[in-house]
Structure formats: C-alpha cells, structure tokens
C-alpha cells in the first residue's frame, strides 16, 4: 500500500514537473520571404509584370480615395516616372470604408514594391480615375443614362461599388497566370499576391452583400442589381462566357445549385474563375478589344504583353 502511495506521489510530481518545464520539439519554419530575383525563371517575367498595370490602378484608386493623394506622395519611386492619374480625388468615406480603403491602399503599395523588386517594373501607365469614366462604365452596365451620373467619390457605398470593379480583375488574372509559371520565387510571389487580392475582393463583396437590398441613392436600383449589371458588363466585354457574378445569383449559379447568395464568385466546383491578359484588357479598356485602349487606360497598359496587343 505504501508502495502504491509513493508511486502515485512520484507520478504526480513528474506530471507537475512536466507542466512547469514543458519539452518542445525543434520547430520547422518556412524561411523568411526575401522576394529577390533568385528562383525567377526568365519566362515568368513578362507574365508577372503584366499585373503591375492592375496594381497601379488599385494603388492609385485606393490611395486617392482614402488619402487624397497617390503614389507620387506615398512612394514616388514606384511610379518610375510614369504620368500621374487624372480625375482621381478624395472620396467622401464613412469611418468603416475609410479604414478598409486605407488598408487596401497601403497593401497595394507593398504589392508594387514586391513585384518591381522581384521581376522588375515599368513606368506607371496613364490612368483615368475620373468620376466620368466610372459613370460611363455604370451607364454601359445599365444600358441607359443615369441622372445624375454615377459618382464613385460621392459616399462610402458608391465607392465600394466602384471598388467592386477593381481587385477582382487582378484576382482572376493571377489565377490564370498561375499554371504557366516555372520559377519557385515567382510562384511564391503570385500566391502571396493572390491571397491578399482575394481577401480584398471578399471584403468588398461581403460589404455589398450585407447591403444587397439597399437602394443606391439617388437611383432606383439596389446594390445587388449594381453588382449583377457590372458583372454582366465585364462578361460581355471579355467575351469568354460567365466568369463574373454579382452578390446575388440564380440558384443554378449558386454553390452546388443550392444558394442564391454569392458572397464569393466561383465556378461550378466553387473554384475561382481565371482570365487571360487579353480578356482582362478587353474589360479594363472598356472597349471589348485588347488592341483598342480606353476606359481606365487611355493610352493602354505598359509592359511587353500589353504593348504587344497595341502593335
């Protein structure tokens, strides 16, 4: 009996000692990211430079909307001497959208820095961020002249509706580029960029989904209608089927044909859609033709892929 009592005391002390002095295994950690040029396959460079066009668009739109100034103030070296955007202005944001867009803005600065450091860059293309350009886009989506013209800088909701048209193009572009990359460093960079772009798109879509039934003043259309019309327009311009969906969809387009909610846009298997550079240019040029600049890029995009279409 005494033996059992002593044994119990010994086990208790051993357990207590283990709790006080836990024994950890040696952790295995991923190396810190350096995003240098090691592991960059030469064949990847053009493909990974192309999205710099979209990152410039996002950075300038978000910086101006949140802060009232752009890269020329925040990180002028990243613009590489390219012309400043025209028509951009500080948006009339509420505290929630101000915080969201400010974070997005600084994230895009980091994206540009990582891309330029890893695969090189090019001068910022001329960007049209004017209210009239967004008004033209929304009118094309609805098929008639809105009175007054849509102004993305009017308030937080209008700005988030305009933002609905921005990160998603980068997202589907990165998904499309992914299978073609060879270098481990460019693959790592793309994965990291895609993760944040997807997160931005999800935040925007969730914000709009929560307000799906709200009528967008001063128009008679709801938030859900705006997202559906913008997505339909982008599908028409890209001319490659349905790869873009609003926050409310017919049940046959919902997840497993079971939902009408569509917080995340995805295909039949709930996998992200993908687009080619040509599709993306047809959309962001607002012309339906990758060889005819317009829309956000009056003079076209920069980099070998975008310029090749203009020859």
Swiss-Prot record:
Its domain of life reads Eukaryota
Question: What class does this enzyme belong to in the EC scheme?
Answer: oxidoreductase
Q: In which tissues is it expressed?
A: Observed in all flowers organs; mainly expressed in nectaries and, to a lower extent, in petals and ovules, as well as in stigmas and calyx at low levels.
The EC designation for this entry is 1.11.1.6
GO molecular function annotation: catalase activity
Tell me the keywords, alphabetical order.
Glycoprotein, Oxidoreductase, Signal
**What does UniProt give as the signal peptide span?**
1-25
InterPro entries given in the database record: Pigment-catalase-like
Q: Which residues are glycosylated?
A: 128, 257, 289
Family matches, as Pfam families? Ferritin_2 (PF13668)
Gene Ontology biological process terms in this record: hydrogen peroxide catabolic process
| Chemical reaction(s) catalysed | 2 H2O2 = O2 + 2 H2O
Q: How does it assemble?
A: Forms homomultimers.
Function of the protein: Involved in the production of blood-red nectar containing the alkaloid nesocodin and that serves as a visual attractant for pollinator visitation, including vertebrates such as Phelsuma geckos. The nectar is initially acidic and pale yellow, but slowly becomes alkaline before turning into red within 24 hours. Together with NEC1 and NEC3, facilitates the condensation of sinapaldehyde ((E)-3,5-dimethoxy-4-hydroxycinnamaldehyde) and proline to form nesocodin, a pigment with a stable imine bond.
PANTHER family documented for this protein: DESICCATION-LIKE PROTEIN, OS05G0151100 PROTEIN
Name it: Ferritin-like catalase Nec2
According to its UniProt entry, this protein's organism is: Nesocodon mauritianus (Blue Mauritius bellflower)
